[in-house]
Amino acid sequence: MSFLGYGTPGDGVAATEFTQCPIVEEGTVVFNFNDPTSVDFRAEGMKDPWESFDKAGDADSFEFGIPSPTPEEMKEFMGGEVKDGKWNAPVDIPIIRKSMKITTLPYKDKQTEYIFALCKISAKISRAPSSEQTDLMLVRCTKLTPVSAAGKQGSPFS
């Protein structure tokens, strides 16, 4: 991965500028893209369904880990505030929405860029520091469909 960053979504569209996360722990980027759920209509005496369609399954998401996060990174992804250089957790669960961008490393003249126009962000400290590793902030980005103020739905993913 050559880039993982976040930005402020526009009105029903993805951000146009992204801030790069300086350090993402190796091996922590995981896509959780779910299969649709099949709904079958069956009739007595018929072996196969007479009709079948797919509906959306669980929401798609991806995760990544930031080792030894700074107070500013904790504020971006966990909410709260930074005061006198220290992060203070929010009193209530925050509502955090961001556009996210991931760019793969180039390979044989190919490179893929993933842009998630609108994501629900949730994060937590998932690993405590020890003598052999740092603490780790695990960030989960759940893909949402952006909707403009005029009610027009935009593409959630490109």
Task: Tell what function each PLM region has.
Residues 1-71, 118-134:
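Solvent-exposed edge beta-strands and adjacent loop segments
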Residues 10, 23, 91, 107, ...:
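Generic low-complexity segments that are intrinsically disordered, proline-rich and/or Lys/Arg-biased
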Residues 13, 36, 85-86, 111:
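Intrinsic-disorder/low-complexity loop/linker signature
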Residues 42-54, 78-91:
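Short secondary-structure capping micro-motifs at structural edges
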Residues 61-65, 99-101, 138-141:
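Beta-strand secondary-structure signal
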Residues 72-76, 150-151:
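Short, conserved charged micro-motifs
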Residues 81-110:
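Short, acidic/charged, Gly/Pro-enriched secondary-structure junctions
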Residues 110-158:
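Mixed-charge, glycine-accented linear interaction segment located at domain edges/termini
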